[in-house]
Structure formats: structure tokens, C-alpha cells
Amino acid sequence: AETAAAAVGDVDLSDKKVGISIYQFNDNFMTLYREELVRYLTEDLGFAAENVVVQDGKGDQAEQTNQIQNFITQQYDVLILNLVQASSAPDVTDMCHAAGIPVVYINREPDVAEEERWAAEGIAATYVGCDARQSGTYQGEEILETATKGDINGDGVVSSRANRRMLTLSTEPSSLLRLLPTRAWKLKSF
């Protein structure tokens, strides 16, 4: 957070418009993510709250694509997208690129070929997220470090309750940094 804020420096972002579309609001992790994202954009980077618009994709790619088209029509300065379907990234990227609007994909990574296309064609698009396999491995290591090693009832099997506890821990903002260490995050800039 400090690095991005430092990179922005003295630039006034208060009149810049940020369009955010989350694949679905009833996902607990993405609820915390979007709340923290809005807080970060407004409090740390200086975007005006009224210029940061977050919409619910409702688990429907057509609905989300319509939201993205509306953001483009309304000339938003940047879009931050958690796609319903990562496979829609090429079409969405092309729409944003044609409008001259940078796009940041979060949490659901477009495929490697698409990311390579951005670099090859000079497209202002990037992905910010974590390596899910590495995060899962790290969470498993955390369970193994507990006194019961996740076997709460002593039956020799990692209890589902331990898994729920890890999920709860992993979605609390204060524990995200511990459960998703810096080395797990990818940041590809444009």
C-alpha cells in the first residue's frame, strides 16, 4: 500500500473515476476485498468516494459485461474487474483498450496467452492476485502448526471446522498478510 501511494505522489486523483465490478457480492472474501479496496482508493490514494463506483456482477457475465460497457460509455478513468468468467478477459480487454481505459483484473487471473498479448500489443491491462495453489499450501502449513494439526475431534482426519476456521482467518483483513504472504502475490504492471 505504501509503495503504490508513494508512486502516486502528489498527483490529485480526486476527480478521477474508478469503475469496479465484482463477480458477485455475496462472496464473503470478495465483500471484504471490495470494502478494503474502496477504503484504500479513497483514504490512501485520494480518489473521491463519489467517483469510486462498485457494482455487483451477480454471477452473470452478461450482466457484468453490460456494467463494463456502461463504465466505458461514462468515460471512467480506470476499471478494476473481478470477472465472473476469466475466459471473457480478451473481449473485455479489447473493449477497454479501444476506449483508452486501463484495466486491472483482480483475483481471477486471465490465461497466460492473454497476459502475454497485453505485453506484446502494449495494452494497458494488468492482473493483481495470488497463486491459489501456493496460498492453499500455505494454509495447510498453518493448520499443521496448530496443536491438533487440524484434527479437532481426534479422529485422524483434518476437521471441517479447522478448514472453516482457516477460511475465516484468511478472509479477515488483518490476517490476509499472514496467510497470503508477499511472495504469493503477483503484480504485473502496465
Residue locations for each model-derived region?
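A residue-level marker of the well-folded mature domains of exported/periplasmic proteins
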Residues: 1-190
